[in-house]
């Protein structure tokens, strides 16, 4: 069944359809959310910045003390093999996710988590890119909303570790969508500073300058970095700073960056139009430039 064979592979090179993919109920991914992750997208079915995603994944391994029991070169080889195996199940113009979820493996209640008692659970799968829900926002912009739920402080969990302990992201997104079903969350930290979206980074334009929060309380997104590089190549000044809701509300333009949709314009913030309520010229220029990387 094509719908059931978009692909999943594990470290032992077993490729199985989705319906046959299983992990133990005692896996640390299930019991503790003890999982690091990366999600890469393809363009023309070629993975975009896979090396950078894997480099970040291995930094997360180091900081979480998860031993993947394979080198980064082996991880890349298995990932590319998986894409090759399942590419015929995708249409010629269809792109996909390449997702890595790696847990510490079997968890023993009351055990010492510093002792990895089993092989890690390495889950790699492909999934169709469904951009339909985001497509309208390229022209009309999204409504950015600040939910009550706050970012987990970096003193508790460094935001640069990309992990699957994502309950607070889910709550924040639910709260934003209760305000507006089409809303995208802008999560603040405990001090009221702008942190990030549940799956992306926040940017604003003010007086021709591109401004984004520092990585003190947000993930250092790869699309974030690409956007900043493009802006500099276009002679747009880039500033990393502490920003607050006031700054977004009074900005000239605003957008969110993330792997699947690259750049999503925001034209409304907490019910108020941003500038004239239209997608701004610098945002449009950055979108076009990013497409042609």
Features from the language model and the residues they span:
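Single conserved hydrophobic/aromatic residue that forms the stacking wall/gate
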Residues: 1-12, 291-292
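N-terminal basic/disordered segments at the start of proteins
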Residues: 10, 14-16, 21-22
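A residue-level signal for conserved active-site and pocket-lining positions in enzyme catalytic cores
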Residues: 13, 33, 57, 100, ...
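N-terminal cap/recognition module
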Residues: 19-61
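N-terminal nucleophile
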Residues: 22-37, 103, 124, 177-290
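Short histidine-centered catalytic/ligand-binding loop motif
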Residues: 43, 58-71, 157-163, 211-218
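Adenylate-forming
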Residues: 57, 292-293
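Extended Lys/Arg-rich, glycine-bearing segments that form polyanion-binding/interaction patches
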Residues: 74-180, 275-278, 282-290
